[in-house]
Amino acid sequence: MLAPKKQKFRKAHKGRVASTAKAGTTLAFGSFGLKSIDGWRVTARQIEAGRKAATRCMKRQGRLWIRIFPDVPVSQKPAEVRMGKGKGSPEFFAVRVSPGRIMFEIEGVEENVALRALELASAKLPVRTRIVRRYE
């Protein structure tokens, strides 16, 4: 799974997702991409599940790029623990995805295979998405 090698701080604020993405809104590598419509927090496990679903559909043909990286530590308190007594320990990493952000890109497979792979990947993500093409 994706995780940063080093962090400046162990714990992060919950934060909010910014209005719309300022960067990463156009296709940079592939011919087809998966663009977010909503703003939400996507975990490293969800990114990995989307990657596995897409590559399995592509049958290891072509190339897949992941354009987002989980760099925000998310902390949780253990189950059945009362409120207070400090913040919980970091459990996993996530990325705050803004609306309009390209998350996955595909190149080197037929159009119907690429569209199916991106549909399967989008089913694993908590955000609403749309598929974009290079010539749009």
Curated annotation (Swiss-Prot):
Query: Sorted alphabetically, which PROSITE patterns does this protein's record hold?
Result: RIBOSOMAL_L16_1, RIBOSOMAL_L16_2
Q: Which GO terms describe its cellular component?
A: cytosolic large ribosomal subunit
* One BP annotation, GO: translation
Q: TM spans, by residue? A: none
Q: Give the protein family.
A: Belongs to the universal ribosomal protein uL16 family.
Q: Which HAMAP family match?
A: Ribosomal_uL16
Q: What is this protein called?
A: Large ribosomal subunit protein uL16
